[in-house]
Amino acid sequence: MMFKSKVKSFYLSALLLSAPFSYAGWQLDNAHSHVNFVSVKKSKIGEVHYFKELSGVLKDNGKAEINIDLSSVETNIGIRNDRMLKMLFETNLFPDAKISGNFDVNKIRKMKSGSTFDVNQSFTLDLHGKKQKMTTKVRVIKLSNQKIIVSSIQPMILNAGDFKLINGVEKLREIAGLPSISTAVPITFSLTFNVETR
């Protein structure tokens, strides 16, 4: 009886220790996540911009939902921030960009802390009233049973024309008096997720 009691206690303890990571989802950590994009003007001058407000979840069924607050764009020039909001993103009509996809969470659960794996990840980007299916290569890093990082391995190229942003780019070019602004935009990201406890 004592042996059975010890075995039962062992399995109960193991279940309690593993439950948060095995059965809960993950919450995006905005303070340790970033989405960057590069604008190229005059065919040779590149500048890095980013968004300050990100939110999202990776659910225990593998469904990922990421929200980018477009009004949080930061270009390090105040008037340019305002112009992007009004002329490019039209945040009065389209305040957010949304990313959705499915991850292999079973593979993540089986990973050891400190291990990584690379995968060609498909997802849907909902931006400026248009949805596009896209694929990019990402690296998943399991820092611990409570924290993972999903980051781009190489820049992803967003074509402004796919999201009806060409007119906005042209407005920015005209008001800034530039000869050109590229409509092909490189994007990189690093997203940190913390396990949700129940």
Where are the predicted features?
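Bacterial N-terminal signal peptides that target proteins for export
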Residues: 2-11
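Short, charged low-complexity linear motifs
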Residues: 12, 23-24
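N-terminal signal peptide c-region/cleavage motif recognized by signal peptidases
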Residues: 19-20
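Low-complexity, acidic/polar, glycine-enriched regions of mature
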Residues: 24-198
